[in-house]
Amino acid sequence: MTLTYIFHSCFVLETEKSILIFDYWLDLNGVVPPFLKKDKHLYVFSSHFHEDHFNNAIFEWRKRHENITYILSKDIYKHRRANKEDADVWLAKGGTWADDTLSVWALGSTESGVSWIVETEGKRIFHAGDLNNWYARFLPEAMPGETIYSEEFDEEIDPIAHEKQYLGELKDIRKITESFDVVMFPIDGRIGNGYTLGGRQFIERFKVGMFVPMHFVASGFESAWRMKEFTDEKGISFWEIRKEGETLEI
């Protein structure tokens, strides 16, 4: 089983029987097309409607691959980024779906849409989508019940309430499972001090075999490697991704 980094939050998981593509946005190095030529069932996941996690170009893949299943978050349809008939499966938080190859659970997010748990061929995979403790750097100055204006987000935010929501989502995930073989999670240096906090809180609550950073395209590969210090402390493998198209055996 291999995992290939495409760009931003997009990965391709190839198993013996199938190919899973998560949160396709851009493919600057043309890594995806060879996967579309393989004679395996193709599953395409999109966690939410944001353009950096969903690109309706994925529907063009039907013309190049006969055996394809689209599993999309319902918010994509709600925000009119796709038509109802475009996806084979629409899921919101709490939804599940399965066939003979894989089982899927849609869990919550602190942004739009969902995060994914996927079980296939003996592995349990987690893709966070935009689930994270995004306002971590504001927590030291935050007061309960009060908002802070954030220039970068251009809105009033409540860091304490947001963290409470995030930790609540983790509790909901623990109702399904307490362990993952592979976790793909945002480690985004743009959000400033504390940008690893969400990842640290995740690995404190789950047994993780391998931690894979994502969502770091604006802050750079090396910024994501900061998380390795914390995974090393817990004996968790960490993928130091260095380029688009890089593949790892998992």
State what each model feature region is.
Residues 6, 10-49, 53-61, 131-176:
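Pre-active-site segment of Zn-dependent metallo-hydrolases
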Residues 21-25, 40-54, 70-75, 126-130, ...:
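Active-site neighborhood of phospho(di)ester-bond hydrolases with catalytic His/Asp-centered motifs
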Residues 70-125, 237-247:
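Metallo-beta-lactamase
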Residues 33-97:
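Active-site HxH/HxHxD metal-binding segment of metal-dependent hydrolases
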